[in-house]
Design a protein with these regions (language model features):
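Active-site beta3 strand of CheY-like receiver
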Residues: 47-53
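Receiver (REC) domain active-site loop signature in two-component systems and cognate sites
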Residues: 58
Length: 83
């Protein structure tokens, strides 16, 4: 059975690692992005992402902007994350 993909987007590498480590232990495949623009690129390259976990405050494109853009074309579940 193929692992479900989750895209974790945060400009803080320590936060991405914390979330990634937890999800990997739960048998998910984790993709990572360090900003909103990178997240958009990955999301549209990888067609079968099951969930996005987005930081609210990021450089280039914040989590709310990413959420709005993705909602134009997809109903994928999105969890907004903030410190």
């Amino acid at each position: 059975m193929e692992k479900r993909k989750i895209l974790v987007v945060d400009d803080e590498s320590r936060m991405r690692k914390l979330v990634r480590d937890f999800l990997v232990k739960k048998n998910f495949r984790v993709l990572e992005a360090g900003d909103g623009e990178e997240a958009m690129d990955i999301f549209y390259e990888e067609k079968d992402i099951a969930l996005l976990i987005l930081d609210v405050m990021m450089p280039k494109m914040d989590g709310w902007e990413v959420c709005r853009e993705i909602r134009k074309n997809s109903k994928v579940p999105i969890i907004m994350l903030t410190a």
